[in-house]
């Protein structure tokens, strides 16, 4: 009898010890699960509060906003300056070390060696087809040429403003411009753009939709053409598609990290007269021209004043980047 009682008591004690062990193990497991859950929750919460670059959001405004550089106090962070100049300049200077000389001069104005880049282009027309603006600040030097005044004006309008563009299928659709900020921009090796305005019955106004020869020529043999037609009227468009593309574009606002330096000429190009240029901030400047060395000396001397009317951007840009953005 005593043996049975001892066995019962021993079994009871073992059960208590086993239960206690199970409870402790369960508690530890629950603590592990809870802490892991809290860690994951806090991590996800932080991520949801951060900017998500993986979501393809629709564009509702300018993507070229000037961003504050959060690391601007670090000594290894510096602004970059791109100086675009015609090949004529380097040919006239004819000095293999002229860029190094200018870099040393920029250093005296607070621009460290290696922060200034010299970009050469053949001519204004070719440069307008693919203006690659990669630096925080971009200065484009254009020597005035009376025969290229229209090209200079259109190039200035193109690079001094941000454009949101969509491709156009002119073989299937008619197009109309909805306001002053809406333009058609054509680019290519040779662009000839013809338009035929249509009435409400889609009949040509002063032209025949079946005869391209009766269309109005708005651009002929150009590499860059910013086409402006009467707003609110459908147009049938004819274009040399083998050598040119055309896009339906809206001017969103100024591209404030770009400035144009007009070299020479009696008058300065003025695109601020365009009512679509808003705000009316002048970022086209003129310097006198006698020799290219004199031009570069002037730019070095006034570089910091020039940059003051600009805003630094945090991303690079090329024509493909902003032309195909939809």
From Swiss-Prot:
N-glycosylated. The N-terminus is blocked possibly by pyroglutamic acid. Residues 253-255 are annotated as: GPR motif. One of its GO terms (cellular component) is host cell endoplasmic reticulum lumen. Residues 1-50 form the signal peptide. One of its GO terms (molecular function) is metal ion binding. Keywords: Calcium, Capsid protein, Disulfide bond, Glycoprotein, Host endoplasmic reticulum, Host-virus interaction, Metal-binding, Outer capsid protein, Signal, T=13 icosahedral capsid protein, Virion. Ca(2+) 2 binds at residues 177, 228-229, 231, 301. Ca(2+) 1 binds at residues 95, 206, 214, 216. Glycans are attached at residues 69, 238. It is found in: Virion; Host endoplasmic reticulum lumen. Disulfide bonds join 82-135, 165-249, 191-244, 196-207. Belongs to the rotavirus VP7 family. Calcium-binding protein that interacts with rotavirus cell receptors once the initial attachment by VP4 has been achieved. Rotavirus attachment and entry into the host cell probably involves multiple sequential contacts between the outer capsid proteins VP4 and VP7, and the cell receptors. Following entry into the host cell, low intracellular or intravesicular Ca(2+) concentration probably causes the calcium-stabilized VP7 trimers to dissociate from the virion. This step is probably necessary for the membrane-disrupting entry step and the release of VP4, which is locked onto the virion by VP7. Homotrimer; disulfide-linked. 2 Ca(2+) ions bound at each subunit interface in the trimer hold the trimer together. Interacts with the intermediate capsid protein VP6. Interacts with the outer capsid protein VP5*. Some rotavirus strains are neuraminidase-sensitive and require sialic acid to attach to the cell surface. Some rotavirus strains are integrin-dependent. Some rotavirus strains depend on ganglioside for their entry into the host cell. Hsp70 also seems to be involved in the entry of some strains. In group A rotaviruses, VP7 defines the G serotype. HAMAP family: Rota_VP7, Rota_VP7_A. This is Outer capsid glycoprotein VP7.
């Amino acid at each position: 009898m005593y043996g049975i009682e001892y066995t019962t008591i021993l079994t009871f004690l073992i059960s208590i010890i086993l239960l206690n062990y199970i409870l402790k193990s369960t508690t530890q497991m629950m603590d592990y699960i809870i802490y892991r859950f809290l860690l994951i929750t806090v991590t996800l919460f932080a991520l949801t509060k951060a900017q998500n670059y993986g979501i393809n959001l629709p564009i509702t405004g300018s993507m070229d906003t000037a961003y504050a550089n959060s690391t601007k106090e670090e000594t290894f962070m510096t602004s970059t300056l791109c100086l675009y100049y015609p090949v004529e300049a380097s040919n006239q200077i004819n000095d293999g070390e002229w860029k190094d000389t200018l870099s040393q001069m920029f250093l005296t104005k607070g621009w460290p060696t290696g922060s200034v880049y010299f970009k050469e282009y053949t001519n204004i027309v070719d440069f307008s087809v693919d203006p690659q603006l990669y630096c925080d600040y971009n200065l484009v030097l254009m020597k005035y040429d009376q025969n290229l005044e229209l090209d200079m004006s259109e190039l200035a309008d193109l690079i001094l403003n941000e454009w949101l563009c969509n491709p156009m299928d002119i073989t299937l659709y008619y197009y109309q411009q909805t306001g002053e900020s809406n333009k058609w921009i054509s680019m290519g090796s040779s662009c000839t753009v013809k338009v035929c305005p249509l009435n409400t019955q889609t009949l040509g106004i002063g032209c025949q939709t079946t005869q391209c020869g009766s269309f109005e020529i708005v651009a002929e043999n150009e590499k860059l053409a910013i086409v402006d037609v009467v707003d609110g009227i459908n147009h049938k468009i004819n274009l040399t598609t083998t050598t040119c593309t055309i896009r339906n574009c809206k001017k969103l606002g100024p591209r404030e990290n770009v400035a144009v330096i007009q070299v020479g000429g009696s008058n300065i190009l003025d695109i601020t007269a365009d009512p679509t240029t808003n705000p009316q901030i002048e970022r086209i400047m003129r310097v006198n021209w006698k020799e290219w060395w004199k031009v570069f000396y002037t730019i070095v001397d006034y570089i910091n004043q020039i940059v003051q009317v600009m805003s630094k951007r945090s991303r690079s840009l090329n024509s493909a980047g902003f032309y195909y953005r939809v």
